[in-house]
Amino acid sequence: MSKLVLIRHGQSEWNLSNQFTGWVDVNLSEKGVEEAKKAGRLIKEHGLEFDQAYTSLLTRAIKTLHYALEESDQLWIPETKTWRLNERHYGALQGLNKKATAEKYGDEQVHIWRRSYDVLPPAIDDDNEFSQAHDRRYANLDPHIVPKAENLHVTLDRVMPFWEDNIAPDLLDGKNVIIAAHGNSLRALTKYIENISDDDIMDLEMKTGEPVVYTFDENLDVVNKEKLDD
């Protein structure tokens, strides 16, 4: 049986300052570094060994993966970075303070933008300082592919081709896989893996730095789910 471990990146600097982050590339906070290292220690304590690692193109997820693998003595395993595991793009909300945005638009509207499955936030302009329209890491993508705003539905549509072409084949081959990514890209994967409804997915929380372990049978059906903690 194969195992898949999902880790939301450790606390970021913008988690700490309560800003919408999305595709903006911010670093881990000091607490986030410790969360990532703790995840690695838990992985080692539970005897989890991996054949393949995946992460996004964003520093906070990449560093979380590296800290976790280093702590578990597995920094050497093959690693693939992909934009398809990036956080959900928050559109024009990127960079804004969440509390101030709620005061301006109302708590209910901001909650809908943040958690609704199919409602898009306002789109970001290309000249916005927090746009990725001219970010070099996406230069090989068709410009129309780089999002201006995403909801969870669009995020799932972005993530699924990578699941089908890379992650699922690894698991079907009996490999153990670790993914360090983001709250919403991992919520999208979790929705698919657990067949969670559009309504119920709104309430799913992904804690920073917490490893979630899935065990799959040969048909890629989940036979066990475990969250690692102290």
Swiss-Prot record:
Keyword Ubl conjugation in record: no
Site, Transition state stabilizer: residue positions: H182
Pathway(s) annotated for this protein in UniProt: Carbohydrate degradation; glycolysis; pyruvate from D-glyceraldehyde 3-phosphate: step 3/5
Disulphide bridges, residue numbers: none
GO molecular function list: phosphoglycerate mutase activity
Family named by the database record: Belongs to the phosphoglycerate mutase family. BPG-dependent PGAM subfamily.
Protein name (database record): 2,3-bisphosphoglycerate-dependent phosphoglycerate mutase
